[in-house]
């Protein structure tokens, strides 16, 4: 019981730390060059999170899911947040858009296909959790919508993502 409480506290604290470090109120360049560790937290950029939120609410706030280089495999940490989103989608019937993105390496055509594979991986997981495919719209932007413009691993890692848009 003590370990469960500690685990929930640690998860919430980590989500809040990522949220505080990643939130931005900028204009068109918001997030450009931001220092986000895509392997931290639940593998997602959470935005602002209130300290009184439950673990489920913290997971619900996660809407960006990061991927390894040249991969469309979901990370286990991302699956936890997607479980909460699946529960919500089944309950309310809302539609969401899954936007697949890549870093700039590779050809435009390859990156469009990789972005689509990433969006499909999230879609497949949500459908396996009971979400209707009709609720999920997929789009791939490939390398066209970077959140970080640097030419380094940290920037590329921030761009290898799927964003869940409501």
Swiss-Prot record:
It is a lipid-anchor. A lipid is attached at residue 22 (N-palmitoyl cysteine). It holds the Pfam family OmpA. Residues 1-21 form the signal peptide. SUPFAM superfamilies: OmpA-like. One of its GO terms (cellular component) is cell outer membrane. CDD domains: OmpA_C-like. Residues 147-166 are annotated as: Disordered. Gene3D superfamilies: OmpA-like domain. The Tol-Pal system is composed of five core proteins: the inner membrane proteins TolA, TolQ and TolR, the periplasmic protein TolB and the outer membrane protein Pal. They form a network linking the inner and outer membranes and the peptidoglycan layer. Belongs to the Pal lipoprotein family. This is Peptidoglycan-associated lipoprotein.
